[in-house]
Amino acid sequence: MPELPEVEVTRRGFAERIAGARIDAVRIGKPLRWALMVMPEALVGRRVLQVRRRGKYLLIDLDRGLLLLHLGMSGSLRFDAALPAPGVHDHFDLVTELGTLRLNDPRRFGAVVYVEDEAAPWAIKLLGGLGMEPLGDAFDLDAFHAGLRKRKAAVKQVLLAGDVVVGVGNIYASEALFLAGIRPTLSAARISRPRAARLHAAVREILARAVEKGGSTLRDFSNVEGQSGYFQLEATVYGRAGEPCRVCATPIRLLRQGQRSTYYCPNCQK
């Protein structure tokens, strides 16, 4: 599933290129997770003002209303002035005077939803429960520690939940916990402020590094140019079960948490 780094890489790939463009047509393919919530022709003639990101959602601001776009489990976007005819997995085209933004989503768990503003019921439903943005100034250490202290679940599960901090997917949670020296099974409520500070910094560092590397391509992800990310090639623990830790040489262990694979070093992480 595309996580925060992949969504941010996607946003940066087309945001400036589509800004100011007039919408000429909207094509809808097979049904996605949620309906568009507006007749496609109602968007024709409107202009794209900017593209923002909130967690794993892209917010495409129009001169009236906005589109909330989620890539789902397997989605990716392309933006080009001359795209080929839509393929079997191309389910949404936003055709503008500057190019077409196309959503390819084989599993169809993604969605594009129109709302009038961020106070609209669907916007609140999709965005209202999201935690802090980890890459901006709003990622406050005190609030982060307080959020952890309220949760008795394993810290990795809390990171994945998205209501304390958004966008920390499975690979990034494993990597951040290793960098912070925290065992993924430790109850979040037991994390002291100094350890929370290390994890806070580690989450920032890992996600920023992942964006710099173009995200991670574990299965389907590619950016708007069709290129894969390569952060996963530099992972310190993720995908390395049985291999020696790069710090202490202890074999990396694999366990299952909530149906997700967790990788950690039993010596470096306490």
From Swiss-Prot:
Catalytic activity reported: Hydrolysis of DNA containing ring-opened 7-methylguanine residues, releasing 2,6-diamino-4-hydroxy-5-(N-methyl)formamidopyrimidine; 2'-deoxyribonucleotide-(2'-deoxyribose 5'-phosphate)-2'-deoxyribonucleotide-DNA = a 3'-end 2'-deoxyribonucleotide-(2,3-dehydro-2,3-deoxyribose 5'-phosphate)-DNA + a 5'-end 5'-phospho-2'-deoxyribonucleoside-DNA + H(+)
Classification via CDD domains: EcFpg-like_N
Highest taxon, organism lineage: Bacteria
Cofactor notes: Binds 1 zinc ion per subunit.
Binding residues annotated for DNA, in chain numbering: H89, R107, R151
Annotated InterPro entries: DNA_glyclase/AP_lyase_DNA-bd, DNA_glyclase_Znf_dom_DNA_BS, Formamido-pyr_DNA_Glyclase, FPG_cat, MutM-like_N-ter, Ribosomal_uS13-like_H2TH, Znf_DNA_glyclase/AP_lyase, Znf_FPG/IleRS
GO biological process terms on file: base-excision repair
Single GO MF descriptor: class I DNA-(apurinic or apyrimidinic site) endonuclease activity
Assigned keywords, A-Z: DNA damage, DNA repair, DNA-binding, Glycosidase, Hydrolase, Lyase, Metal-binding, Multifunctional enzyme, Zinc, Zinc-finger
Cofactor dependency: Zn(2+)
A Pfam family matched in the record: H2TH
Enzyme Commission number: 3.2.2.23, 4.2.99.18
ZnF locations on chain (FPG-type): 236-270
Active site: P2, E3, K56, R260
Assembly mode: Monomer.
Cited function: Involved in base excision repair of DNA damaged by oxidation or by mutagenic agents. Acts as a DNA glycosylase that recognizes and removes damaged bases. Has a preference for oxidized purines, such as 7,8-dihydro-8-oxoguanine (8-oxoG). Has AP (apurinic/apyrimidinic) lyase activity and introduces nicks in the DNA strand. Cleaves the DNA backbone by beta-delta elimination to generate a single-strand break at the site of the removed base with both 3'- and 5'-phosphates.
Cited NCBIfam families: fpg, PRK01103.1
Record family assignment: Belongs to the FPG family.
UniProt protein name: Formamidopyrimidine-DNA glycosylase
